Amino acid sequence: MAVATVDHRLRAQAADEAAMVAARCRELVVPHVTLVADEPVAGASVQARAREVRYRLLARWADSAGVEAVATAHHADDQAETFLMRAARGSGLAGLAGVRARAVIGGAVVVRPLLDWRRAELRAIARRREMPFVDDPSNQDLRYDRARARRLLDEHEWLGPANIARSAAYLAEADADLRATVDWLWAARATVDGDDVRVDAAGLPREVRRRLARRAVAAAREAAGIAEPAFTDATNVEALLDGLEAGKRVTQSGVLASVREGRWRLRPAPLRRG
């Protein structure tokens, strides 16, 4: 086992906090390293950018250190906060499933073994064992969505963070099952010939078609080397689906899609002249 602490360089106190972790690890004879952000963490969403940088650094460290999995301390309250934040943004099934117990991020296997535990329970254990810990002041900064969600849960215990976390786990299970179904349908109904992608989507439910559409667009973009505009497995494809349902030709993220008798064809969109 080894421990890594990420210093995002967002707060002056972070270096001292990393040193505290390093000292505790020395007492336990556990290898420790502090990973310092190698680029400024800034932008419209500082917390989202910090997460991106954090997991990139952890993935790089895991690879170089031969670590099989990175374990994080996300707990049930974190899960409930994530659920509320994403519900407020109108997220679908995959988003409401929240933080996964196991995921691959940046090539690293990430596990979260504490998702069934409440924050207060973990604090109590740490105090009984006289384990030092630090409260991140940004968790109380109401400029951030997560801090506002945390305040809401703290002030309204009836919301039941543990129950919300349990619901997120059920949704994660449903999302995984649906993902497996889409994998099977992709193998059975899709053909990829270079940057020419064809999918038989006839008779399929909209959520299945939504996921197949994202995969088809991604496949065409990858084959054609299209990098801009950005496209992820969370990109909104509703206009694309609506257009295909109406029998129209539609462009999505640099890919031209057309339909005939329920069969889609996606290929790179022609470059605009002028």
Question: Residue locations for each model-derived region?
Answer:
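Core alpha/beta nucleotide-donor-binding catalytic domains of modification enzymes
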Residues: 1-152
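AMP-forming adenylation/ATP pyrophosphatase catalytic core
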Residues: 2, 6-8, 37-39, 53, ...
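Residue-level detector of well-ordered alpha-helical segments, enriched
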Residues: 79, 163, 208-212
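Short alpha-helical scaffolding segments that buttress acidic/His motifs in well-ordered protein cores
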Residues: 83-84, 164-168
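Residues that cap or delimit alpha-helices
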Residues: 118, 157, 204-206
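Short, surface-exposed loop/turn segments at secondary-structure junctions
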Residues: 136-140, 161, 225-228
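Conserved anion/nucleotide-ligand pocket segment
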Residues: 151-163
